[in-house]
Amino acid sequence: MRVRRSLPWLSLIALGLAVAPVRSAADEEDDAAEVRYRVRTDAALERMTVEVCFAGAPPRSLGPGIDRAGPALLDARKGAQALTVRRGRIDTSGLSDGDCLTYRVDLDQARRASRFSNRQGVDFVGSQGAWLWRSRRRPPEHATIRFDLPDGLRVAAPWPREGDGYRLNRSAFRRPAFVAFGRFEPIRVSSHGVDAELVRLGDGWDFTAEDTTAWLRTAIEGVSTVQGRFPVSNLLIVFAPGDGSGVGFGMVRRGGGCSVGFIVGRHSSADALRESWVTWHELSHLQLPPMVQEDAWLYEGLATYYQEVLQARMGVQSPEQAWAALRDGFRRGARGRERDALAVEAENMHRTYAYQRVYWAGTAFALEADVALRQRGSSLDEALRRGARTWRGGPGVWRSERLTALLDRSFDAPVLGPLRDTYARRVAFPPTAELLERLGVGRGGRLRAAPLESVRDAIMSR
């Protein structure tokens, strides 16, 4: 049986979108000690008015989290006094301690500045960086945001609740999140240690809210088989409609909390939802903390590995199908052009398009690591379960050296660190045929008796 899995970026390119973080130039501003935001919109969600109050000294200027959102700024005022605006930045140098200002944003223009934005009638989703102005060099350490919306409108955001609003940490100003506004009815599930909220943009979905809830519960249950609980405590998921059937594309964002945007066929069946591998890939990213781009081989590889493993564990596909998908992926990864060390390829993959090699070499690492740990009486599941106690909910971006050093602490001798070093420096695609032979995985995923068949079977078991 020939099994192919397209990588998420292929669906993204087909939709005319682009994967990229929020990028902005640093300036020389200082941050305020505490900032309070109050957000209002009109009923059509065409205009947004934001009041910003500073508990301490204001910064010298405020700007958007996304540079190209600057033209969306309509005006800014302190009371009746107009404030100077230059290239989308608000001059706040004349404000005093404890002052407030108000600015207005054209939401359609802001949405167009936000990558992976989508509007369906009134409902829309985009990055907060397109409408949340802040000090850009040093964002506030403590901030809250409150939404006062017209009747019938809702906001869905991934940030921790505080009173009648949300609490924003610095990552909410430094990284994008998916934030949705509209007339949707949220679907909420609390299970396996996570409070999850899901919203669907627009009308005309063929699958029901009950189908969506079942999909979400199954996904949470499956992902939780790795660490014994869901890897994060709060999660926002946004469904934007697309063509085709099932989940066609997904993206994880971690600005102030974890959010995932999915493009889903509006006319999908419940079975098509359940059988979409993109679900498992994107949610598996949450098993790890945020990591630097040069380690994309590790975090994309681990997500690709678990997308197959978790489907087998949940009965979405058979173990034979999962092994066939992995074997086929290794073959495609090995066909990629070998230019540089894997870590270098990962850092440059959006420029060189070396996605197949980066993803599948990282998947080979995950498989080899899992097998090595299981031979020692542990597993990759167990290593992640222990490591997550350190990074869950914490700030900062990790490097693979630090990550593997943490995971190796429970072993008599380092296992993952040396393997990580070998893979990061490797130019040639890793040899996988011998390992698959020892696991008893043949062509088409056919399984046979082999020295490591017990390890093979345990990987796909719950």
Regions found by a protein language model. Name each.
Residues A55, R104-E185:
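Extended, low-hydrophobicity, Ser/Thr/Pro/Gly-biased non-transmembrane segments
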Residues R40-D42, R68-R119:
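A surface-exposed beta-strand-loop module
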